[in-house]
Amino acid sequence: PPSHYPYSEEMLSLCDREGIVVIAETPAVGIGEGGKDPYRWAPADYHAQVLTDMIARDKNHPCIVLWSLGNEPNTDAHPQSAYDYWHPLYLLAHQLDPQNRPVTLVGCQNDYTRDITIPSMDVVCINRYYGWYNLSGDLEAAAFAMRMEMDYWATVNKPTILSEYGADTIAGMHGTEMFTEEFQVDYYKTINACLDERPFVVGETPWNFADFGTQQGPMRAGGNRKGLFTRDRKPKMAAHYFRQRWENFKK
């Protein structure tokens, strides 16, 4: 997925060496949430400075293929205000990068047809959890919702990446219901089938590589368990599924 924050220089150098592509992202998460028009108080000048610093430091890393302005902003409640905030940052990113890499903003809003900001980016990146947070456990309904949304994004005529999707999975728990390893595989097979039907979808980035700790809460069973690997890097069934899937892409 997009990085959610600028990676360390050491990590970017490792990605350069190993051929791992990176979507470099400013640490701007959830901008535009709350209030009648929250973009009136959004920190545009500071955001521009952070973007400037990130591109100045990291522009020479060949692993970076895409700049992301931020993650999961509210871009549909006040569409014009959102566009007025994000579009100058989009132009700034193109101005700053001598290689003129494409620029994106990762969207997550449910009323995507009202959004005028995400469609204006060079690449459409969307985070979607049909079958998990929405339509929980109902993979047939999740597939229908995913196909309906992808039909909409096809009209935008931009390369599209499903930049987050996943299901919490407790390693060693088996069955057909949510939180089992089997459900995680079925979930990914269901959503990936929707993506494979659409040639404008150019990428998929499962959330997440490995389980990680979070604050306690009723939605977290000992942290975020959406990893393809456990916290100590042991593969779940989904890791083997994706290895086979991606190896077949090479053919």
Give residue ranges: language-model regions:
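A short, acidic, amphipathic alpha-helical segment used as a generic capping/interface helix at domain edges
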Residues: 188-193
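Aromatic-rich peripheral "rim/lid" segments of glycoside hydrolase catalytic domains that contact
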Residues: 198, 202, 207-251
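Short, well-ordered beta-to-alpha junction loops that form the rim of enzyme active sites
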Residues: 107-108, 164-166, 208-209
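Active-site mouth of glycoside hydrolases
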Residues: 1-135, 143-159, 169-174, 178-182, ...
